[in-house]
């Protein structure tokens, strides 16, 4: 089945926040990210995770990053690796609602061994991105150890490292569909009209986003969003589809308020979401739910929206 994802689809997929909920209601996410020179990727992903609604977040980082996180993002709890510069030791993961790994991780031999232990020990789906994908592409046996219903988020070059060079975009898409079904995972094949391939063979095409989002840090933010949704007990397929759409919508709002060329992962701009958008018959439900997530836009593109 091939589907184009719309605002209406997303509006009915988003969960409401119950008045008597507490932070435990919205899950505890574990993000394994960052290495020497790449702590910014971990920080962007972590902020996106909490801004997307996760109740609690623990970030496993090299010890070198402790002062960075404690200063820049005090809301996140830290799990410190034994290595000062990169991921080498596996934290206890049994108590977390969802696990994500990859942003800024680096590609070290000890990291590869630690990733294998994560895959073998996790009883929950794992979001796998960036350097975690690259490590696995160099150790293809690791793909047979991915927990079912996990989510891979490769861009085209990363996917080609996994499945081999593709002759064109359609060839790559068919490979992604087959790979997702074979390994019983979701694949988020990033790009224009990002395609989400489900284990059942369904493909969902995202209908929003723009070229301004092709910028450093954008993928790290997407990982944080999807991880957050998984922690909040969305199904992996729904977390991937909703996460990609929210990410694209944030980019479209930012592009409307600034040029695509000027978009970076933390531009500051101030614009208003018009009341007509919020109240229109067709978009009202979507935007009323979207307003709950407006702080996310500030993290993705520095977008501060006043209502």
List where the protein language model places each region.
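Small-residue (G/A/S/T)-rich helix-start motifs and N-terminal tracts that mark the onset
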Residues: 1-127, 134-151, 156-307
């Amino acid at each position: 089945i091939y589907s184009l994802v719309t605002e209406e689809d997303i509006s009915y997929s988003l969960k409401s926040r119950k008045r008597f909920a507490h932070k435990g209601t919205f899950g505890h996410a574990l993000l394994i990210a960052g290495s020497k020179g790449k702590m910014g990727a971990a920080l962007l992903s972590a902020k996106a995770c909490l801004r997307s609604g996760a109740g609690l977040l623990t970030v496993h980082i090299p010890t070198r990053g402790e002062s960075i996180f404690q200063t820049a993002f005090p809301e996140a709890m830290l799990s410190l690796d034994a290595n000062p510069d990169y991921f080498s030791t596996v934290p206890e993961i049994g108590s977390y609602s969802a696990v994500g790994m990859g942003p800024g991780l680096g590609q070290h031999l000890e990291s590869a061994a630690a990733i294998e232990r994560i895959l073998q020990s996790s009883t929950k789906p794992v979001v796998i991105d960036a350097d975690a994908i690259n490590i696995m592409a160099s150790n293809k046996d690791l793909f047979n150890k991915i927990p079912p219903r996990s989510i891979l988020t490769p861009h085209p070059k990363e996917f080609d490292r996994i499945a081999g060079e593709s002759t064109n975009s359609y060839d790559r898409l068919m490979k992604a569909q087959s790979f997702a079904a074979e390994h019983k995972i979701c694949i988020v094949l990033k790009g224009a009209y990002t395609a989400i391939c489900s284990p059942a063979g369904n493909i969902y095409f995202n209908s929003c986003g723009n070229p301004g989002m092709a910028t450093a840090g954008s993928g790290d933010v997407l990982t944080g969003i999807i991880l957050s949704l998984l922690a909040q007990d969305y199904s992996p397929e729904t977390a991937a589809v909703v996460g990609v759409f929210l990410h694209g919508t944030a980019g479209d709002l930012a592009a409307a308020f600034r040029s695509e060329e000027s978009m970076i992962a933390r531009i500051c701009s101030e614009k208003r979401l018009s009341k007509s958008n919020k109240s229109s018959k067709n978009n009202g439900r979507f935007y009323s739910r979207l307003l709950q997530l407006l702080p996310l836009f500030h993290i993705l593109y520095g977008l501060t929206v006043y209502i």
